[in-house]
A protein has these predicted regions:
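Small-residue-biased structural context
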Residues: 1-144
Length: 144
C-alpha cells in the first residue's frame, strides 16, 4: 500500500485495468455458471453487471490511451505505435462486444442457446485479448 503512493500514474492505471479485467472474467464465469444451471434471471443480472463494468473499462481505457497519444515526448513516442495497433486491432471486437452486451442486457431479450454460444465465443476472444493487453501493452505502459 505504501509503495502505491510512489507508483507512476501509468502503473496505477495498469493496476486498475488489471483489476477490472479480473472483475470482467469473474462476471463472465458467473454468467456461464448461472446459465448452465438454468438460472436465467441470475445470468441476466450478472450480464447487466458485466455490461456496466465492460463499458466503464473500455471508456476509461480509450480516454487514458488517447491522453497518452496526445503527449509528445520521447518516452510516449516509443509506445505510440503500439497503442495505435491495439486500438485498430481491437476495434471490431469491441464493437461486437458492445452490440452483444447491449442487446442481451435488455430485459425483454431472452437468454437462449444463441446467446450462450455467442457468449462463450466472446469470452474466448476476450480472454486472448486480455492476455495480449496485459503481457504486451500494459507492460510497456508501466515502463514509461
Amino acid at each position: 500500500m505504501f509503495f502505491d503512493l510512489f507508483s507512476s500514474k501509468n502503473k496505477k492505471i495498469v493496476k486498475r485495468w488489471m483489476k477490472e479485467h479480473e472483475e470482467i472474467v469473474t462476471l463472465a464465469h458467473k454468467i456461464i455458471a448461472a446459465y448452465s444451471s438454468n438460472n436465467h434471471i441470475l445470468a441476466k443480472k450478472e450480464l447487466i453487471s458485466l455490461n456496466n463494468t465492460a463499458v466503464n473499462h473500455l471508456m476509461n481505457e480509450d480516454i487514458e490511451l488517447y491522453k497518452l497519444l496526445k503527449k509528445r515526448n520521447d518516452m510516449h513516442h516509443k509506445i505510440e505505435s503500439d497503442i495505435k495497433k491495439f486500438k485498430e486491432n481491437f476495434s471490431e471486437t469491441k464493437i461486437n462486444l458492445m452490440k452483444f452486451l447491449t442487446y442481451y442486457s435488455k430485459a425483454e431479450t431472452p437468454l437462449d442457446e444463441s446467446f450462450f454460444d455467442q457468449f462463450n465465443s466472446l469470452v474466448g476472444i476476450l480472454g486472448e485479448r486480455i492476455d495480449f493487453e496485459e503481457n504486451n501493452l500494459y507492460q510497456k505502459l508501466e515502463a514509461i
